Amino acid sequence: MKLFPRSILIILVLSFALNLGLVTKTHAKDTLDSIVDILSGLTCETQGVGDLLRTEFSHTCIVAPFFTFAVMNLVSPVLYMNTFLKLKINDSDLFNDSNFGNFPGGQCTRENRIDPKNPELRFALCNNAKLIVSRAKSVAESALAIAKAVLTGGDPWDDIKKAWENKKKEYHIPYSGKPGDDGFAFDAGFPVIYWKIIQDKDRICVSTKGFTGDVPVGCKYMKEPFPKSMYNSFMDVADKDFIQDPKETPTDPLALVSCSAAGGGCYQKAYNASKTAVVMTSPLIECMRQMIARLLISKDVCSFDNVEQVVNLASRQDSALFQFQVGMYKIVTAFLTLYVMFFGFKLLLAGEIPPKSEYINFILKMIFVTYFSIGINITPGNGSPYDRLDGMIQWAFPFLLDGINGLASWVMNAAPSGLCKFNNLSYDGTVSYIALWDALDCRVAHYLGLDILSTLLVENAYRSHDFLNFDFFSFSAPPYIYLLIPAIISGNMMLVSLALSYPLLVISVAAFMVNATIMCMISIVILGILAPLFVPMFLFTYTRNYFDSWVKLMISFLLQPMVVVTFMITMFSVYDYGFYGKCQYKSKLIHNSIENLAQSGGTSSRDVLIFYINNDWDDISQYPDKDAVESCQNSLGYMLNNPITTAFNFAKDSVSEIVDSKPGDTPTDKFLAKFQFLSGVVLGPGMFFMSPKVLFEKIKNILLALVTACFTLYLMYNFSSQLAEFAADMTEGVALNNVAIKPQAIFKAGMAALAAAGAATKGVDQIASRGGVGDLKAGQGGGVSDNIAKSGGGGPNDNIAASGGTSAPTVTTPTASSSVATSSPKTVSSEARSDVVTPPPAPSEAVSPPPASIRTSISTPAPQSNIETESVGKIIRDNNQESKKEIDNTPPPQEKVDNAAPQEKVDSTSKGTGVIDYSFNLKEHENPAGVKQIRENAEIRDKRAEVEKAWNELVASGGGRIRDQQGEETSERRTNAEKKWNELVDSGVVTEIRERDNSVTNKFDKLADELNKSEKAKVEENKNIENDRKENNTTTSPQEKVDSTSRGSGVIDYSFNLKEHENPTGVKQIRENAEIRDKRVKVETAWNELVASGGGRVREQEGGEVSERRANAVKTWDELVKSGVVTEKKDNSSNENS
């Protein structure tokens, strides 16, 4: 019996051996081949290798080159290979039932791609434990088949082949999942396998962990519109912001748009994501970020979060960085080659083995330079520039650009009062940076009062349902508004400037922050594009400084916005404490119903976070003690923003204190003395007047708060001027002053505008207070026209001598050629004095010159002088009044005489006559209030031109008072000229002034007719001395300035003493006028000396003997001509008129 089992086994083996020879060779061979094939997959790993070598890829539906597996094994060692060999997706034997999934024809056919409506991926993982059980079962079934064949004498091979059929479903475990699902698979050998379902554009993949994150192992395509289609350049399936119904994602291609204008664009994306009531800066930053992403990555993406979509696609060729990288391939390769060569020479020449650290440093430098300059090729043997891991767009740019907002947001959210504190966790991940700019917009809107309406509604609606403290007037009106309203009503520009100084500074610093951030982002982009040029310089010691400077600038532009934000938070915090004390803010997230009304009832999904002062004084989390409550209630901001609540709380507390107290046996006066309120309601000395003590305390608190705020404003204003340099010094970078708006730019512009408005208002008030231009009369009647005889009207120095243009003729000795000139609207009194010519004596019957010789100064022969010397002072004072009127709004004349300026007016008739033209170019004054004055001056100049024309015609026709005395025959031309002149005299446009006593002048006139040429100079000098004595006996006004050389010649000098203009901008003009007058005096003195000595161009033509005095005078005059103070005009063609 003991030998029975052994005997049975021997019999079975012998029977199997005998029957084996009866089977056909072909049948046995096929069966054995099947068994060998199956036994080659004794484990899941060996089976995976076999499938990889003999069949198509079973682990994925998307074929990839073998080199990809090698790279992925480096990124995810062990894990990737283990998952790769066990994963099954493309296997029709598995996925043909309800358990694994029924996919006729296999999972990878186009018809069986993943439905985007239900993006579920089915896959299976091989399990070694179940595989061992399956193989043991096959061995047992084979043994039974052999025993059966021995006993029955049949063929066992069919049963054996059936026993060894590859029953994959027995040792594969089915899985399914959607993007984001993950799990673990437990097995023998390598016990745990981690898997996760991820979506990569139009593919859903099974991934495992690696050094760089989730590494895809096997993938399957989704249905249309995927894969690559006409919409792929602007589609992003992962973006659900613009999809109303996520279940209907693939049905409408335009619903997938996230970067195009069809989705609202960058502005709409930022606006919808913002949570502040007044959106100002976040759309600007979002549009800048999208522009940078398109510039650096591809035009098909609008965020660095989508960089993986185009890493291996040809759409990257539109990137500026990519194009520069392609151009730098050979140069970077040359740098790396030189580095390898130098390192090899170093090893050969060192004579000893270098430490291992140098080898490690060598390898790390090579990897670093390649990764950040041109990218590492992830497909060995593939020369495509698209299959590269680029460190700049995958790591550097996202870190730097997100870091700018990240660092600044840390500081911005550190507000002690809780005002405008936005948590970036409440935003979508792609727009979390908007929390920083929402905080900035919120603060600017709060300090400028732009959120008054929204805060009013929300605060009253959510006031802890305490309607006893309901205050309809409670809103966040900034304190400056309470100064601005009375300032505008009163018209006090100083008060307006004080009220607007803080909001202007807030706007200016906020604008600088936005501008500085954008400039830092642009600078980082520029430096990043140049990375292929600067990063290879890291290899060599000689060029290392260039790389260090490049990195230092990158870090500086990263940190500078944080410094600016720190300054802003400090400024805002001090301001909050100065105006609001220890008040704390609460926030409420509401739906923007106001926005819906503005959009005509449209729906809006944007929620707004509103901040208002917490008036729940029992909230110990924000008001831990009574001092904090009193600090808030007594603050200026709270009292101004909550006037009714403040009064109500004050009255309630006072009355409650009295009611709750029991007098007992205390006398009434002592009982009432216990209450501070009652003891304070007595009149007491205030700061400026008698007032109740309680009211005085409130006024004192308000004034102290204002002083604190002004002092804070002063400190912040001065510090802000150096903010850009301070930020640059802290970060050792470049200051942004030259490329960004300065922190005080808007503040100074606003203050300048207020100053200009104040000056304009002041100028209008002055004109109105004078009663208009018509009131500026000399007291003789006739309005403005009465003043023409006394003053010019074209500018501060457009004063015409009595002998010229609009005044009566003057008398000099008989001359051969009388110099009569027309007046220019832009000439001055010194011109009249300088144009005096004393020609040699001539017969009394000399005729008057032709009209071509007319100039401002009139020199005509006359036996009598028609100037009334007693009225000189009155004439000068009248002209002073008119000149002051014109000076207010007229710019200073140019110092250069007779230059070639376009406005210069040159009288060609004066050439060759020895008359010097001193016409100065006057420009329009910048004060707009002078427009009316300038228009009236133009009317005066028109009247003057009319007077000059009439007088010139009168003189040219042989008329005038001098000719009347000579008894000449009156021609028709002379008659008409006299008629026209008399009409002007009768209408009051011009006034003739005559001198009473002419005996001295007549005496010298007769002597001058009898003297010869050699004695005339001496006689003229004596005549001037006599006239000096006569003029000294006449009382003149303090402003009168008389030229001694012109006395007796009929020329009156109208020089005026200019007073300080009320407009401070006119001080410079007055100073320049004074310098011009000094130059004129110098010119007049030299010219008068030249004429008195017998010199001048007219005398030179006579060939007289040159005296020492004349030589000195000529020398002085020539020096003035050479220095450009005066320009002498000559015309040789008119010498015959001299």
Curated annotation (Swiss-Prot):
Biased composition (Gly residues): 775-784
GO BP annotation list: protein secretion by the type IV secretion system
Region (Disordered): 775-914, 958-977, 995-1071
UniProt record similarity statement: Belongs to the TrbL/VirB6 family.
Source organism of this protein record: Rickettsia felis (strain ATCC VR-1525 / URRWXCal2) (Rickettsia azadi)
Signal peptide segment: 1-28
Main location: membrane
Comp. bias regions, Basic and acidic residues: 875-888, 961-977, 995-1032, 1058-1071
Disulfide bonding pattern of the chain: none
Extent of Pro residues compositional bias: 838-852
Biased composition (Polar residues): 854-869
Protein name, UniProt field: Uncharacterized protein RF_0089
UniProt subcellular location: Cell membrane
Segments traversing the membrane: 331-351, 359-379, 392-412, 494-514, 520-540, 554-574, 699-719
The UniProt record lists the keyword Transmembrane helix: yes
Recorded topology in the membrane: Multi-pass membrane protein
Record-level GO cellular component terms: plasma membrane
Superkingdom, natural source: Bacteria
Positions with biased composition (Low complexity): 801-830
Record keywords, A-Z: Cell membrane, Membrane, Signal, Transmembrane, Transmembrane helix
Pfam assignment, any one: TrbL
